Amino acid sequence: MTEFCAPKGVPDYVPPDSAQFVAVRDGLLTAARRAGYGHIELPIFEDTALFARGVGESTDVVSKEMYTFADRGDRSVTLRPEGTAGVVRAVIEHGLDRGALPVKLCYAGPFFRYERPQAGRYRQLQQVGVEAIGVDDPALDAEVIAIADAGFRSLGLDGFRLEITSLGDETCRPQYRELLQEFLFGLDLDDETRRRAALNPLRVLDDKRPEVRAMTAEAPVLLDHLSDVAKQHFDTVLAHLDALRVPYVINPRMVRGLDYYTKTTFEFVHDGLGAQSGIGGGGRYDGLMKQLGGQDLSGIGFGLGVDRTMLALRAEGKSVGESARCDVFGVPLSEQAKLTLAVLAGQLRASGVRVDLAYGDRGLKGAMRAADRSGARVALVTGDRDIEAGTVGVKDLGTGEQVSVSTDSVVDDVISKLGR
């Protein structure tokens, strides 16, 4: 066994799985880029206070799951557990909110949460995300949701469902909070859960323990207590989703794990993943920007799990991504032949052809075995005699047929054989 291994809960992606990883990561954001969302690259770590204030101190993310440490300057920093707070911080810091609105941004990368590792739940999780900041418009909510839906479908995934609800606004949330606390304080909850109920009662509804879920099954539902404005907003979002033909299921008991969500809140679920069924989600966060020191502007966004989407595709028996296999494999039979084939490989690669070469002293048989394993359709075989004659052997690895081709014509001949 090797002396060093990846840390627990931190997956490696190596070929051929890495090809699917890249395809999923990029595919999930294809619809966003077509809708005018520009790329933003965020720091891997931020000031701890950004997440404590933005995500919410009562959340499991902040209280239990963050990787937080003091740097050499004794500053408290945290590996990013999610993307929205960092995006909002960047929008404020760089004055993007002073330009055209909404600010449309997308991102991809690793995020970090200290969780109990299991299939689909990692301590380093790969996500893509989208944020639209500056406009409070239900049509924008629908656009963001439709982009996520299109991202999954572009990969061929179809066994998922969109669950959606509204978490209300500043008008109805305080009244509902009192109603929910009254209900919760009437239950036989443990001390820690009662503390959470006092601090933020919605967090209790997000508790995954079966005994707590059973006790809160009859809790009042926020969707039944929406203000007129929040209800109108939600109804309009649903109308737009209907027009866009994005199917959804209303889940009145949905509670997302982050405190900044308001109004529209949604999650994409795939039952093929077992307990870790969520493959992405998001919502509106109308007070977050002001809370982080910026203008009082609204926003909406989502985060989609690359790791979990890969597992969902596997559950459906589907695969995406172009493998690293090459089209052409070069077999040099001498040192001079290595130079000749290196030049031809460069010319073919410049034309979009994937080329690999045999390195080391494998001999003809060993090099041809490597060519067969490479998955290439064509092998280029040459030695000193071929170089003197100004030719290269071009072998069809499917039929075994080999012909001598003028060195100057090899590139065109190979491209023709590949049907390019």
From Swiss-Prot:
GO annotation (BP), single: histidyl-tRNA aminoacylation
InterPro entries reported in the protein's UniProt record: aa-tRNA-synth_II (IPR006195), aa-tRNA-synth_II/BPL/LPL (IPR045864), Anticodon-bd (IPR004154), Anticodon-bd_dom_sf (IPR036621), His-tRNA-ligase (IPR015807), HisRS-like_core (IPR041715), HisRS/HisZ (IPR004516), HisRS_anticodon (IPR033656)
Cell location: Cytoplasm
GO CC annotation terms, alphabetical: cytoplasm
Substrates-to-products reaction catalysed: tRNA(His) + L-histidine + ATP = L-histidyl-tRNA(His) + AMP + diphosphate + H(+)
GO molecular function, one term: histidine-tRNA ligase activity
KW Hydrolase (keyword) present: no
Key words of the record: Aminoacyl-tRNA synthetase, ATP-binding, Cytoplasm, Ligase, Nucleotide-binding, Protein biosynthesis
Annotated HAMAP family: His_tRNA_synth
Subunit structure: Homodimer.
Protein family membership: Belongs to the class-II aminoacyl-tRNA synthetase family.
PANTHER family documented for this protein: HISTIDINE--TRNA LIGASE, MITOCHONDRIAL-RELATED (PTHR43707:SF1), HISTIDYL-TRNA SYNTHETASE (PTHR43707)
Protein name as catalogued: Histidine--tRNA ligase
Organism for this UniProt entry: Mycobacterium ulcerans (strain Agy99)
Gene: hisS
